[in-house]
UniProtKB/Swiss-Prot annotation:
GO terms for cellular component: DNA-directed RNA polymerase complex. The gene is rpoZ. Its EC number is 2.7.7.6. Keywords: DNA-directed RNA polymerase, Nucleotidyltransferase, Transcription, Transferase. The keyword Nucleotidyltransferase applies. SUPFAM superfamilies: RPB6/omega subunit-like. Belongs to the RNA polymerase subunit omega family. It catalyses: RNA(n) + a ribonucleoside 5'-triphosphate = RNA(n+1) + diphosphate. GO terms for biological process: DNA-templated transcription. This is DNA-directed RNA polymerase subunit omega.
Length: 114
């Protein structure tokens, strides 16, 4: 059983940090039941993911897109753009009102009899 190292994968994904993110995403997919593209050989999911990347049986671009989708909390819609513009104008109005309000005296010196 040959050990896979980061050096085996760096020519496929030049940035080591990106490689770790992509391999972790693939390992999570394998844990979730995704089909393996290489023999497991009693390796754990992260090692299998690195071997798949090294042997180019999975495409890094697809893994990157899956990673981005998994990190998005809310998927953007076309209707959301209109709401954001309305929200920005409401926020600007609230900021204008706050800036125009008189400053409150928050010192405790006059009320404190110490």
């Amino acid at each position: 059983m040959a050990r896979v190292t980061v050096e085996d994968c760096v020519d496929k994904v030049p940035n080591r940090f990106d490689l770790v993110l992509l391999a972790a995403e693939r390992a999570r997919a394998i844990s979730g039941g995704a089909e393996l593209t290489v023999d497991r050989d009693r390796d754990k999911n992260p090692v299998v993911a690195l071997r798949e990347i090294a042997e180019e049986t999975v495409r890094p671009a697809v893994l990157k897109e899956n990673l981005i989708q998994s990190l998005q909390r809310v998927l953007p819609d076309d209707d959301d753009e209109v709401d954001e513009i309305g929200s920005l104008s409401q926020s600007a109005e609230a900021l204008r009102i706050t800036a125009a309000a008189p400053v409150r005296n928050t010192s405790l010196g006059a009320d404190y009899d110490g």
